[in-house]
Amino acid sequence: MTDIFEKCKRTHYSNEIGPELAGETVKVTGWVHEIRDLGGIVFVLIRDKNGITQLTAPSKKLSEEMMADVRAARKETIITLTGTVQESAKAPNGVEIIPSNIDVINVSQLPLPLDTTEKVEAEMDTRLDSRFMDLRKHDVSAIFKIKSQMLHTARNYFYDNDFTEITTPKLVASATEGGTELFPITYFEKEAFLGQSPQLYKQMMMATGLDNVFEIGQIFRAEEHDTLRHLNEALSIDAEMSFKSQTDAMNTLEELIKRILSDISTNCQKELSDLDHELDIPTEPFPIVTYEEVIDIVNSRDVEMNYGEDLNRAAEKVLGETMGSYYFITEWPTAIKPFYVMPNSDDAEKSTAFDLMYRDLELSSGAQRIHDYDLLYSQIEAKDLNPDSFEKYLQAFKYGMPPHSGWGMGADRLTMVITGAKNIRETVLFPRDRRRLTP
């Protein structure tokens, strides 16, 4: 018996078959996407990860047995087609394949959980329930190919700039920033939590002498938000740098974003075309507005915002309409930022914290961090937190902690921006929110 892997071994992907191969024999493997039986001729569209190939079966040119094999094709069945390439202006890529052999690799059951041709639209929940099939649609898989390129570029950028990749625990004994947005779990006979952020570990790494570190990993927040931009499990890109100011950190973040956009523009044109989305690639430095300037902008548009308040949804919308594209917000009030954020040396009520925004969407938060043990200890107390809960973290600040800065960025939100997705669930393979824990 012929080995199944030998049977389905292709010579080309669909996007590699063009008019230049006319007259040649090719072998393609994929899923039956669509079937049109016009009586004297049958068209079968075969889909693989790179596109669609058309099988054309004219009854006058093929045996009855071959026509029977073609007509037996069932949607989403995997087949391997061997045949001759023939030019056809109406077919995908300008060619069709006249079959000489068809091998059925695996037959699909019917009915299908959703329509991969998208002639029948499916609700988001239906799509997520059958995510494996949802990703067979090229506009859906395009999002994850772009996300893959984004993460690949991010890693390359960090490696090129002398960063060391780290992996930090996701099971932790206490909150990173305090608060109640924690998922408690039972850790043998102790209470533990899923990590909100690698922040404390990144800072501890600054005491090791590695200077620059980054991590790409999951974070968990027990937020009850049920919005198009929040999830309870998310992917975060984090960086921390010794002997670098918040301005240096902002420059690193901007450089990374621009390199990601450039690489995606170069390497993902087909995917962007599948999404019918045009990249927004800034050529100028990202604008910077202070927190106080944000208040003036928001209030001038009849949305109330007072000093010491975070941006609410109405304020974000107004700011996004005013600023457009990518921009930084700086000089946030110290009182509303985490305990580890360094106050401004000129005015302690203002901090060194910054946010990177894209229109009305927050992408990243960062700051210069406090490196002085006594100041850090007092800031923990000022936030009504117990320093004893941070004993191991604080220890790293007793023996020569360098001044340092860093940031964390939501990779899923950045994917939304790059792909034009309106719902963050579109950018995560198996999203987790308050209503969804499967698949």
Swiss-Prot record:
Reactions catalysed according to its record: tRNA(Asx) + L-aspartate + ATP = L-aspartyl-tRNA(Asx) + AMP + diphosphate
Record-listed Mg(2+) 3 binding positions: E362
Location of this chain's protein in the cell: Cytoplasm
Residues binding ATP, per UniProt: R221, A222, E223, R229, H230, L231, E362, G410, A411, D412, R413
Pfam family, one: tRNA-synt_2
Primary localization class, coarse: cytoplasm
A GO term, aspect molecular function: ATP binding
EC number: 6.1.1.23
GO biological process annotation, one example: aspartyl-tRNA aminoacylation
Positions contributing to L-aspartate binding: E177, R221, S365, R369
Record field: transmembrane: none
Binding positions for Mg(2+) 2 per the UniProt entry: E362, S365
Cofactor binding note of this UniProt entry: Binds 3 Mg(2+) cations per subunit. The strongest magnesium site (Mg1) is bound to the beta- and gamma-phosphates of ATP and four water molecules complete its coordination sphere.
Cofactors that this protein relies on: Mg(2+)
Protein keywords: Aminoacyl-tRNA synthetase, ATP-binding, Cytoplasm, Ligase, Magnesium, Metal-binding, Nucleotide-binding, Protein biosynthesis
Positions bearing the site annotation: Important for tRNA non-discrimination: P92
Cellular component terms per the entry's GO annotation: aminoacyl-tRNA synthetase multienzyme complex; cytosol
Highest taxon of source: Archaea
Region (Aspartate): 199-202
Catalytic EC class: ligase
Function (record text): Aspartyl-tRNA synthetase with relaxed tRNA specificity since it is able to aspartylate not only its cognate tRNA(Asp) but also tRNA(Asn). Reaction proceeds in two steps: L-aspartate is first activated by ATP to form Asp-AMP and then transferred to the acceptor end of tRNA(Asp/Asn).
Family: Belongs to the class-II aminoacyl-tRNA synthetase family. Type 2 subfamily.
HAMAP family given in the database record: Asp_tRNA_synth_type2 (MF_02075)
Name of the featured protein: Aspartate--tRNA(Asp/Asn) ligase
Name of the gene: aspS
